[in-house]
């Protein structure tokens, strides 16, 4: 009888050890389309705060194919901030959550324009896990021949696979269409796209597009082609760059955020209290006021905005959802 008890204990211990080993093996998780930090933290039995701490996340924004730590200790910045080198010459940096081109450039004593040139970037969009060249000579353009040729399928229409550095406006210009049309064809209600995503660029819109968000169609929207002279890392700096990314550049002479509504109106922009994707949310609250870029308008009336110098230090890009009951506290520059 005693032998049986001992055997049972040994067997149970072995099973527990295997289970513990399996649990410990799950130290990382690759983000799948549609997943959220809440779903991932719930899956691994950790808090959202713990998940964000492990991965140095400054917001709840995550991307498909992003690899997240789900156990262990938080990543130290010593390795991530040290560029790697390769035999082809030059140094590389792996983008971390919360990075921006300007922030990376300041780390390595260069300019964001130089990083864009080294990597063949034509917009400011970068994503966690992306490897950027930070020194050396620019890579020869080698990936546009196939990636820029849309594929077709039997159901009609052509498709394009998103490459690193792409934006909706850039893709639209490649195929002689508008970013609004690409959003309509794919049922998009915000400007978020990611490498590897397949977008329809010609044909008819899908019947199940379900998007209730409209872009700023019908608004008077002048377009400027100015250099960004706003102070680096401020809310005005970010919104200027974000509008340039979508092909709706604004003036670099609107000064502080609390002057943007009046200055925009003087330049001929439509100003109202109705947010649309791509519009600028503006408030006079605070000494200098504040501006944000509207990334998405949700079905419940809330809006997702991107901003700088609000809940984090200057130069750190953050995202937050403005509740529906607060949306009317802002004016929207279209």
UniProtKB/Swiss-Prot annotation:
Gene3D superfamilies xref list: endopeptidase domain like (from Nostoc punctiforme), LysM domain
Reactions catalysed according to its record: Hydrolyzes the link between N-acetylmuramoyl residues and L-amino acid residues in certain cell-wall glycopeptides
PANTHER family: LYSM DOMAIN-CONTAINING GPI-ANCHORED PROTEIN 2, MEMBRANE-BOUND LYTIC MUREIN TRANSGLYCOSYLASE D
GO biological process, one term: division septum assembly
Signal peptide: 1-25
GO molecular function: lytic endotransglycosylase activity; N-acetylmuramoyl-L-alanine amidase activity
Enzyme Commission number, as recorded: 3.5.1.28
LysM domain: residues covered: 27-70, 91-134, 158-201
Cellular compartment(s): Secreted; Cell surface
Gene Ontology cellular-component terms listed: cell surface; extracellular region
Coiled coil: none
Protein name per Swiss-Prot or TrEMBL: N-acetylmuramoyl-L-alanine amidase sle1
Chain intervals for the UniProt region annotation (Disordered): 71-90, 137-156
Function according to Swiss-Prot or TrEMBL: Peptidoglycan hydrolase involved in the splitting of the septum during cell division.
Organism: Staphylococcus aureus (strain MRSA252)
Superkingdom assignment: Bacteria
Residue ranges, compositional bias (Low complexity): 71-86
Sequence ranges assigned to domain Peptidase C51 in this UniProt record: 210-334
UniProt-listed InterPro entries: CHAP_dom, LysM_dom, LysM_dom_sf, Papain-like_cys_pep_sf
Enzyme category, top tier: hydrolase
Pfam families: CHAP, LysM
Keywords: Antimicrobial, Bacteriolytic enzyme, Cell cycle, Cell division, Cell wall biogenesis/degradation, Hydrolase, Repeat, Secreted, Septation, Signal, Virulence
């Amino acid at each position: 009888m005693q032998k049986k008890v001992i055997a049972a204990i040994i067997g149970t211990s072995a099973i527990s050890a295997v289970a513990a080993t399996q649990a410990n093996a799950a130290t990382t998780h690759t983000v799948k389309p549609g997943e959220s930090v809440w779903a991932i933290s719930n899956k691994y039995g950790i808090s959202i705060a713990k998940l964000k701490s492990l991965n140095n996340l400054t917001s709840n924004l995550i991307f498909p194919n992003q690899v997240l730590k789900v156990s262990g200790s938080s990543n130290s910045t010593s390795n991530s901030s040290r560029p790697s080198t390769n035999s082809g010459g030059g140094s590389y940096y792996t983008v971390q959550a919360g990075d921006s081109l300007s922030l990376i450039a300041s780390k390595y004593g260069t300019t964001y324009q130089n990083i864009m040139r080294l990597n063949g970037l034509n917009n400011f969009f970068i994503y966690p896990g992306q490897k950027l060249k930070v020194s050396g000579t620019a890579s020869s353009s080698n990936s546009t021949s196939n990636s820029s040729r849309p594929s077709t399928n039997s159901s009609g229409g052509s498709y394009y696979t998103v490459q690193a550095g792409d934006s909706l406006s850039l893709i639209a210009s490649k195929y002689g269409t508008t970013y609004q049309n690409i959003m309509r064809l794919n049922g998009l209600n915000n400007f978020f796209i990611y490498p590897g995503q397949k977008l329809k660029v010609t044909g008819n819109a899908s019947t199940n597009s379900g998007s209730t968000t409209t872009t700023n169609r019908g608004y008077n929207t002048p377009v400027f082609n100015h250099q960004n002279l706003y102070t680096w890392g401020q809310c005005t700096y970010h919104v200027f760059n974000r509008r340039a990314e979508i092909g709706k550049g604004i003036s670099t002479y609107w000064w502080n955020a609390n002057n943007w509504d009046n200055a925009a109106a003087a330049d001929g922009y439509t100003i109202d209290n109705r947010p649309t994707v791509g519009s600028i949310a503006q408030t006079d609250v605070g000494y200098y006021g504040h501006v944000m870029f509207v990334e998405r308008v949700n079905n419940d009336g809330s809006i997702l905005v991107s901003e700088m110098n609000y809940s984090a230090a200057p130069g750190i890009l953050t995202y937050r959802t403005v509740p529906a009951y607060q949306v009317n506290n802002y004016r929207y520059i279209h």
